[in-house]
Amino acid sequence: MVKMPTMVKNKINILEEVENMKINKKVIANLTKCYSIAPLKYKGTNCFLVAAEKIDRCILFDSEGNEIETVWNEPGGVMSMVQVPGANGQFLATHKFYSPNDSKEAKIVIATPTKDGKWSIRTLVNLPHVHRFDLIKRNGKTYLIACTLKSGHEYKDDWSNPGKVYAAELPNDLSNFNEEFQLQLKVIKDGMLKNHGYYKVMEEGVETAVISSEIGVFQFIPPETEDTEWEIKQLINTPSSDAVLIDIDSDGEMELAVLAPFHGDTVRIYKKKEGIYKEMYVHPEPVEFTHALYGGNLCGKPSVVIGHRQGKKSLFALTYDAEKRNIQCENIDTGCGPANVYHYIKDNKDIIIATNREIGEVAMYTIES
C-alpha cells in the first residue's frame, strides 16, 4: 500500500507500508502507567529496569524478560533511570515527577543494591520538575546533564516558567550524598519552554545530548577539558517534543528525526544541506501524542521506531529504501500506547522492550527480518 502525502520539491514524497519483519510479542509484566526503561549491568549480567510514572513499582528484569525483583514499591514518578558507570547495579533515577502539573517535589535519587539483598535509596539532588537526565562521559570525566520541563508551577497547565538544562561533574564516589548533602548543579541553558525530549547520540566518537523543546532542538557537547564549557548547537528552531540523530539513508551524515510539537502528532525527518537541517520527510498521517522514540539499527537497517499514546496507539518503524528512494513504514503493534522503548540484541535477534503505558503492560517484541 502506497500513500502520497502532500510534499514540496526535493523532499521524499512516498511512504510505503511494508511487512518485512517477523514479530513476536510477549507481555512480561502488568504495571499501571508503566513509563521508564533503562539497561542495567548487575552481578555480571545484562538486565533492564522498568518503572512507573505514578506511585507503583520499579522492576528489575533479566534479558529474557523474567522478573528478578522489585527495587521499590513507591514513590514512583520515574521519568528517567541511568546506571552509574562501572557500578554493580547502582543507578540514578527521577522520583516524584507524576505529571507536568505535579512535579514540584521531583528529585534525582541514587539506588544501590545492598549486601542483604535490598536496595538503598538516597537523594542525589532535589530538582523540581526534573524530567530527563543522563550521564555523559568525555576524556575520563562523567557529567550529569539534567533537564527540567519547567522551572515553576502555580496553576494547571502553567507554562509561564520555562525549563532549564543543568550540568555537573559526577564524582566517582556517591556514598556521601543524601538529603542534607546534595550534588551542586550549574545552569548551562535556560529559556527552554516545554523542555521535554532527550536522546544520547554518539557523534565523531563523543557522547552528546540531543534535547528538544518548544524553542527547538539543541545538541549539547560536554567540555573537552576542565577549562572549557559545554558547547551548545541549535539544530532546528521548530517546536519539538523528542528528536534523535541517525543516518537513516546511510550516506555518511546523520539526519534528524523529530516528533513535534510537544506531545504532538507530527513526525518529520530533516536532512542537513549546506550546514542547515531542511525538511526531508513528513509522515502523512497524524500520530497522536507521539512519545516513544528509538533511533538505531533494527534487523541490520538504520531505523526510527516511534510509539504514540492516543489515536491508534501504534508502535512502528521507519526505514529508508535506497533503490526506491522512499521511506518505508512497518507496523510493530497497535492499540498499545507506548511511552518509551528500549532496544537490544540477544542471540542475534533484535529485542524491543516497550512500556505500553496506556494499557498498563510491559511488552517484549522479538523481531527478525
Model-derived segments and spans:
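Short, Lys/Arg-enriched N-terminal segments with co-localized hydrophobic residues
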Residues: 3-20
